[in-house]
Structure formats: C-alpha cells, structure tokens
C-alpha cells in the first residue's frame, strides 16, 4: 500500500516514525528459489506481502508494547469471536496491507459504527497504526500481523465481511512479474466467498495496467458485480494520500474499483 509516510515514495518525509515504513504491504511474491513458470501450482503459495526489513522507531515500539496486547490479535488456525473482540456486533471490514496505517485510522475515525480488521506483516507499520490508535483513541480497529491469504483462510468466516479494502497493492510492473500480483482469480474468489451478499470489495491502484487487470479479473468473477460501468469515483471514505496528491498534480492517474457480491438467485 502506498501511504503518506512511505519513505520509498518520491519526496516522502523521513521522520522518526516514518523511516521504517514498508514500501507496500500487499505484495505477492514467491518464496526464494521458487520457479513460478515451472510450477503451475504457484498460485497456491501466493503471498500478500514481500519480506522487507525495517527499523521500528521508539514511538512505534512503545505503542506495540502498550497497545499491542489489546489491539493486536495473534494469528491462529481458529476463527475468533469477532463480536466479543470488538465488544459489539457491527459491520466488519477487512483491510489487506495497511502500510503505516494513516488511511486506516482516518477511515475508522470517519466510520465509528464499523469495525476494521487490518492485516499487515511489517512491524513498523503495525507500530505506526497502534500509535495512531492511541493518539486518536480509536476503538474500532484490530490488527493481525500475518500473511493476509492465510488470515482470510483461517480466521475469517465465509459470508461474514461487510467490506474488503485493498489500496495500492504492489503493481509488479514488469510483465514477467504480473503473475505475482495479488489480484488474481483464485484470490478474488477467496475474497468473494468471505463477503456477505451485498458486501463490497474496494481496490485502488495508481498503475493503469494493473487497474485494467483488476477490472478484468473482478468482472470475470461470477459472484461479483461492478457498481460502476468500469472504474468508480473515489468513495468519500478513502483518503487522498500525500503521495497520491503529488501524483495527481503530475498528471498521474488513480483508479478505484468497487464491486459488490451478488445476492443468491
């Protein structure tokens, strides 16, 4: 995910809590030594991230130590009682790859009646979002620090999500790497299976080629329907990041896609 505090973005600031930012948390890469082209089953091993080293700042570490026990849910093979974890029954949205969490926190503050499960593998991003949770006194976010593909399979019940957010996943812009992209038919089918009928899947990217692939893959899934003719206007709840503003000023495009799960029959 590209976010306001990404130090890998052009012109991004380098402060104490930003220097450890992952470039993207929604990166699908094969394990070292895998030969995707020789193994037709490589999609079974798709990951929602790429391993990236990062330094955890003092503020992030403090947030992890102080707030982690309440807001970070350990990965496990059983489905948690999410109503009990959040202390209520409310619409539930899964965000895959929240980066440094600025957009996640802003959306959660804007939508206090909804609960958000953020999945991110990189510890600096987890610490950054926990820091925002503490500063803004947000109670409607929980975090799982693990691969989103496995989280979805093990910890999220079918037909249980009211929404899924995937903002600015790694575009893998070289043609030979397109098979590593997260938005592929098997994963989209898995996402759709965990959405309630009528629930939405919202993807955003600033790479036109990836936007075109997203549109093709999402449109081909028989359980999903597009809410727009092709690309959707940016929903008001999705913040415009500093990186995105710079890109728009330079004439770069951003594409939002919002699909809904069809009702049975």
Curated annotation (Swiss-Prot):
Matching InterPro entries: SAM-dependent_MTases_sf, tRNA_(Gua-N-7)_MeTrfase_Trmb, tRNA_methyltr_TrmB_bact
Catalytic activity: guanosine(46) in tRNA + S-adenosyl-L-methionine = N(7)-methylguanosine(46) in tRNA + S-adenosyl-L-homocysteine
GO cellular component term of the entry, any: tRNA methyltransferase complex
EC number in record: 2.1.1.33
Gene3D superfamilies the UniProt entry points to: Vaccinia Virus protein VP39 (3.40.50.150)
Compositional bias (Low complexity): 19-32
UniProt keyword annotations, A-Z: Methyltransferase, S-adenosyl-L-methionine, Transferase, tRNA processing
Residues the entry annotates as binding substrate: 174, 206, 241-244
Region named Disordered: 1-40
Positions that bind S-adenosyl-L-methionine: 95, 120, 147, 170
Residues annotated as catalytic: 170
Methyltransferase as UniProt keyword: yes
Gene Ontology MF term list: tRNA (guanine(46)-N7)-methyltransferase activity
CDD domains, per database record: AdoMet_MTases
Pathway per the UniProt entry: tRNA modification; N(7)-methylguanine-tRNA biosynthesis
EC main group: transferase
Pfam family name, one: Methyltransf_4
The family this protein is said to belong to: Belongs to the class I-like SAM-binding methyltransferase superfamily. TrmB family.
Function: Catalyzes the formation of N(7)-methylguanine at position 46 (m7G46) in tRNA.
Protein name: tRNA (guanine-N(7)-)-methyltransferase
Source species of the chain: Burkholderia pseudomallei (strain K96243)
């Amino acid at each position: 995910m590209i976010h306001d505090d990404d130090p890998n973005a052009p012109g991004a600031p380098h402060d104490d809590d930003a220097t450890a930012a992952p470039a993207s948390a929604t990166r699908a890469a094969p394990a070292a030594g895998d030969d995707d082209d020789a193994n037709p089953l490589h999609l079974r091993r798709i990951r929602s991230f790429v391993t990236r080293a990062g330094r955890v700042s003092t503020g992030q570490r403090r947030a992890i130590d102080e707030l982690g026990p309440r807001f970070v849910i350990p990965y496990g093979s059983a489905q948690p009682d999410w109503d009990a974890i959040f202390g209520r029954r409310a619409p539930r949205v899964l965000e895959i790859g929240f980066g440094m969490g600025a957009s996640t926190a802003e959306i959660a503050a804007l939508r206090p009646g909804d609960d958000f499960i953020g999945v991110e593998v990189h510890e600096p991003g987890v610490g950054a979002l926990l820091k925002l949770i503490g500063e803004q006194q947000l109670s409607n976010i929980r975090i799982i620090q693990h691969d989103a593909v496995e989280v979805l399979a093990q910890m999220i019940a079918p037909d249980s999500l009211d929404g899924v957010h995937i903002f600015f996943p790694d575009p893998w812009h070289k043609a030979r790497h397109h098979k590593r992209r997260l938005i592929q038919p098997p994963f989209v089918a898995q996402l759709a299976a965990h959405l309630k009928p009528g629930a939405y899947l919202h993807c955003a990217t600033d790479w036109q080629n990836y936007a075109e692939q997203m549109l093709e893959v999402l449109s081909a899934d028989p359980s999903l329907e597009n809410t727009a003719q092709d690309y959707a206007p940016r929903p008001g709840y999705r913040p415009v990041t500093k990186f995105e503003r710079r890109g728009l000023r330079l004439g770069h495009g951003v594409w939002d896609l919002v699909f809904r799960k069809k009702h049975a029959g």
